[in-house]
């Protein structure tokens, strides 16, 4: 019965959100996978990168939200970059698979400053299977119906980069799309609204040897109909091989973060997140694992 109360509460939150606007992917370690939110970042690392994240919310609760993410980024010449992203999200009976391809172009602003322009194109495969809902012999709501739709989308962004700092502006999904279903006069609507992202970060050198850095970064999300969300991220970096720090997400969560460069090609990251929202006070922790390969 206790587990059923958890499931009922989370389902209510999820379906209330779906009735108005679908929230895009939240990544705590956003500085490690910027091209998910900004196509202009594709190729900006000046190397080929394959990164994967697994995010499990409210661990210990069956069928709680999960996210798997894989992205690839590389340069296609002196000024052109390309990336591919695949994001899979599952929340109880709801599944989303968003696949995109990114292209970027680099403009040399000065000797130490690069400006990248990016475009993103792809779509979202959205599925709701109400047959998988366990009702515990309680009559299900007739407004809950199966949905299986594909929604194409496009995005754009700019990324300004110097050795010690960056600025990012992007709208990864520009189209305002609706997923509708009508069964026996009952209409179900879920809306994807454009999200605006703005981010910046700076590397402060803390010692004369130049191997100890403080790396603050800020990410702002805005979507019409929802409060502005801001991630404030601060990492302490030792020789750029070991990083430890934390994140605060306004009115939502705080997290502890750690990144370890196991070799010149392989990075392992971990985030342990706790919600600050009263309605989720009894929910479990959220874990996020990052694997990153550089070539």
Residue ranges, per PLM feature:
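Bacterial N-terminal signal peptides that target proteins for export
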Residues: 1-8
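Bacterial N-terminal signal peptides
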Residues: 8-16
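Subset of outer-membrane beta-barrel
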Residues: 22-295
């Amino acid at each position: 019965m206790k587990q059923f109360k958890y499931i009922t509460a989370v389902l209510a939150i999820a379906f209330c959100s779906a009735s108005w606007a679908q929230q895009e992917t939240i990544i705590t370690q956003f500085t490690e996978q910027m091209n998910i939110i900004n196509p202009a970042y594709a190729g900006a690392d000046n190397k080929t990168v394959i990164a994967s994240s697994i995010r499990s919310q409210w661990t210990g609760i069956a069928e709680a939200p999960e996210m798997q993410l894989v992205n690839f980024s590389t340069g296609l010449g002196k000024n052109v970059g390309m990336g591919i992203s695949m994001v899979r999200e599952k929340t109880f009976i709801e599944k989303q698979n968003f696949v995109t391809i990114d292209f970027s172009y680099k403009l040399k602003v000065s000797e130490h400053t690069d400006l990248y322009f990016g475009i993103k194109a792809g779509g979202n495969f959205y599925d709701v299977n109400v047959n998988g809902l366990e009702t515990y012999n309680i009559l299900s709501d007739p407004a809950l119906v199966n949905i299986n739709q594909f929604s194409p989308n496009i995005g754009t962004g700019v990324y300004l980069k110097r050795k010690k700092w960056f600025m990012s502006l992007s709208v990864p999904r520009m189209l305002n799309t609706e997923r509708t279903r009508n069964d026996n006069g009952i209409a179900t609507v879920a809306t994807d609204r454009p999200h605006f992202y703005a981010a910046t970060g700076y590397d402060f050198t803390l010692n004369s040897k130049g191997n100890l850095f403080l790396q603050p970064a800020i990410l702002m999300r805005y979507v019409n109909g929802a409060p502005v969300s801001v991630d404030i991220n601060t990492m302490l970096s030792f020789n750029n091989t070991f990083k430890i720090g934390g994140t605060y997400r306004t009115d939502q969560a705080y997290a502890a973060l750690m990144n370890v460069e196991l070799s010149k090609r392989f990075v392992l990251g971990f985030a342990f997140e706790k919600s600050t929202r009263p309605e989720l006070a009894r929910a479990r922790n959220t874990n996020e694992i990052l694997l990153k390969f550089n070539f």
